């Protein structure tokens, strides 16, 4: 079966012309926006996914007897790992939940084996981060398109809240944004603007590709237990600016949640490219295959200590991980520099140490100090 999958080799990545200059331009523009947001709040936030909805701790189970093409990287051997998840809204500022936005599911898997991607990994070299969003593709799938789109994204995020809250205006805004940048919006992005589906019932995607051991894949997380499956497609009742925080918190006070983590392996680089994250990898060509199970028990997802820990202390970066899950494509390459620069700024301005958890003990220490 593995013969149908494209083998990873360094040549699958092809740097774009003037890519380094484009990356420098993007990171400088993002740093400028970061400073502007800091001046508004007198507190530094992430330049993407600034607002958190909740912070979860749970367990990843890697099952026994995965087939060879799936038993790759940190999923090569059965076992259990502690995990942490930060749920968030995508914009790089603190907007009202009444404003429709993509949502994020940042997964940190603790104490994984394997050679590190970065020689001087600021994450202390223990974990694997997978960053996912409830959209399967990016409108700006390359660094060049991202550079074109960036001023319009910044302009849209600075629009007055009443304008942003109108679903119709958001849908028009998506078209307006991408048309001004010179390329069409994917149907998946337009569809996102139609409603605010329950964040715990959504499927989350890495959007861009990464190495999956001997192969190439995109990673996703989907609801597994009935407790979250029944929330899929359900409209959230958002009556105040931080309603999603309360929706998530109320859920985990009563219920547990289970999700599957999946890999969609590349079968053809022509139709499933790594250098353009705007191209949807069709399930007819390669279905999503289960590689693990995530379990989240009942818990308080937004205590004051957890909010500070997830928003100010922790970092999530697709380059915090092992070589067998190397991020691929120009969008992932720009993230290497952009995320590092943003994290450094955030920790410095908020006078927080750049540390990573060795276990849940690190989180418990913060919760104890918060009591």
Predicted regions and their residues:
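Charged, compositionally biased non-catalytic regions
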Residues: 1-57, 121-182
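An N-terminal, globular interaction/scaffold subdomain
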Residues: 9-117
């Amino acid at each position: 079966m593995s013969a149908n999958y494209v083998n990873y080799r360094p040549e699958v990545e092809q740097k774009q012309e003037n890519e380094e200059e484009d990356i420098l331009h993007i990171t400088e523009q993002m740093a400028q926006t970061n400073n502007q947001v800091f001046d508004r709040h007198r507190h530094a936030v992430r330049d993407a996914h600034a607002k958190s909805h909740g912070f979860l701790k749970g367990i990843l189970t890697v099952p026994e007897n995965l087939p060879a093409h799936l038993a790759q990287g940190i999923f090569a051997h059965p076992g259990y790992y502690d995990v942490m998840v930060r749920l968030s809204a995508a914009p790089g500022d603190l907007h009202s939940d009444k404003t429709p936005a993509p949502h994020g599911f940042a997964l940190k898997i603790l104490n994984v084996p394997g050679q590190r991607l970065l020689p001087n990994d600021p994450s202390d070299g223990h974990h694997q981060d997978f960053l996912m969003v409830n959209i399967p593709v990016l409108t700006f799938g390359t660094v060049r398109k991202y550079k074109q789109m960036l001023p319009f994204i910044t302009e849209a995020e600075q629009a007055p809240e009443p304008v942003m809250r109108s679903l119709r205006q958001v849908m028009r805004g998506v078209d307006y944004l991408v048309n001004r940048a010179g390329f069409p919006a994917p149907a998946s992005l337009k569809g996102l603007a139609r409603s605010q589906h329950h964040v715990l019932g959504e499927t989350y995607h890495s959007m861009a590709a990464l190495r999956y051991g001997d192969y190439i894949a995109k990673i996703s997380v989907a609801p597994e237990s009935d407790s979250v499956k029944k929330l899929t497609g359900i409209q959230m009742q958002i009556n105040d600016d931080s309603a999603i925080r309360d929706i998530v918190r109320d859920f985990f006070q009563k219920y547990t949640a289970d999700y599957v983590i999946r890999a969609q392996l590349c079968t053809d680089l022509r139709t499933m490219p790594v250098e353009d994250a705007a191209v949807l990898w069709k399930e007819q060509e390669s279905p999503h295959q289960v590689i693990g199970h995530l379990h989240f028990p009942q818990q308080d997802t937004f205590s004051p200590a957890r909010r500070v820990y997830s928003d100010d202390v922790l970092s999530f970066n697709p380059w915090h991980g092992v070589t067998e899950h190397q991020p691929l494509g120009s969008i992932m390459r720009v993230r290497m520099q952009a995320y590092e620069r943003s994290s450094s700024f955030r920790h410095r301005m908020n006078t927080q140490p750049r540390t990573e958890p060795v276990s849940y003990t690190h989180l418990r220490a913060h919760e104890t100090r918060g009591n």
